[in-house]
């Protein structure tokens, strides 16, 4: 039996134009699309990208305003804030320039490297910048990344997180910010190139090069490793701002060794930087120090803006506890307030908390865990008792006595007492 088939002329599934009416007809699974519809889709996507960029660039604050907003959340680090504010402002102005079609001068992208001790505010600076600019933001830990083909996380998964942050709006994601933390942990194991594979060090640096410089990356929308059968989202990284951060423990010795090397005589090397702290030493940082530390020259070249952050002292930690809009003490006070209770932390207690964080060398990052440990029992009790005032003193912080709890109902006026005592300027 012969089955007769109608040989119908192929048509575009979108505009219904016949094959002979268009230049090209591309076949997909049970559908066809013509070159004209492809051009139209491309134009729509370009227009969406322009709109997304216009929304960002039209609301970019000036460097001084960016710095002012950073001051509300980040304590100290004035030079780093100034450098970041100018860098971010110039980055998004560059996008506006590129989108305008001007090509008389080519403006290159300037990614940023932040170097500073643990808890000095690197991550907070990057997060706050993204909040100020209202752009998609994601963070990645460099230690979890490995070179493609090895156990670990591919660098494309960082781009997937940015897409998720942008709710899969590709145009928006392409103008976002990616913060890669602990980038010092992917330094190669020795200064000289190794014949063995360094998949979590130099291999990761090599993998990051392309996306940091600018490429159209194939991102698996479901995450995980790539395989030929899966679909990919194409993401252009040319306009994504990369901020890398790390503590770079030991780089101060490299800098000191270099600066002392030029001195003459045996006595010259005897701790001429003895009185300098790490922050002062880091200000003498040069590219060769980063290379000696283990970053490859090509990777350093993708991070033209390098800024160092100061180690936080006792005074700065007390300010972090009490002054910013998101101050940790203010957060705990609000938590107590939700249970009809008050939290009072006196000056001596604040001093003791700061000293504990300094002793642990955790910087601002350790303040929350210290307070959480101090207030755990009090938070456990006030939820039941209600109307309680909890007082934290130096003795409480040092573990000599329990937090002092008094009833708010016993006071006649029942007025709230000052929650933080004035801290001397």
UniProtKB/Swiss-Prot annotation:
Domain ClpX-type ZB, residue spans: 1-53
GO biological process: cell division; proteolysis involved in protein catabolic process
SUPFAM superfamilies in alphabetical order: Glucocorticoid receptor-like (DNA-binding domain) (SSF57716), P-loop containing nucleoside triphosphate hydrolases (SSF52540)
CDD domains: RecA-like_ClpX
Binding-site positions, ATP: 117-124
Stored Pfam families: AAA_2, ClpB_D2-small, zf-C4_ClpX
InterPro entries in the cross-refs: AAA+_ATPase, ATP-dep_Clp_protease_ClpX, ATPase_AAA_core, Clp_ATPase_C, Clp_protease_ATP-bd_su_ClpX, ClpX_bact, P-loop_NTPase, Znf_CppX_C4
GO cellular component: HslUV protease complex
One GO molecular-function entry: protein dimerization activity
Endpoints of the signal sequence: none
Keyword annotations from UniProtKB, A to Z: ATP-binding, Chaperone, Metal-binding, Nucleotide-binding, Zinc
SMART domains, per the entry: AAA, ClpB_D2-small, zf-C4_ClpX
Annotated Zn(2+) binding sites: 12, 15, 34, 37
Domain of life: Bacteria
Quaternary structure and partners: Component of the ClpX-ClpP complex. Forms a hexameric ring that, in the presence of ATP, binds to fourteen ClpP subunits assembled into a disk-like structure with a central cavity, resembling the structure of eukaryotic proteasomes.
Stated family: Belongs to the ClpX chaperone family.
Function: ATP-dependent specificity component of the Clp protease. It directs the protease to specific substrates. Can perform chaperone functions in the absence of ClpP.
HAMAP family: ClpX (MF_00175)
UniProt protein name: ATP-dependent Clp protease ATP-binding subunit ClpX
Gene: clpX
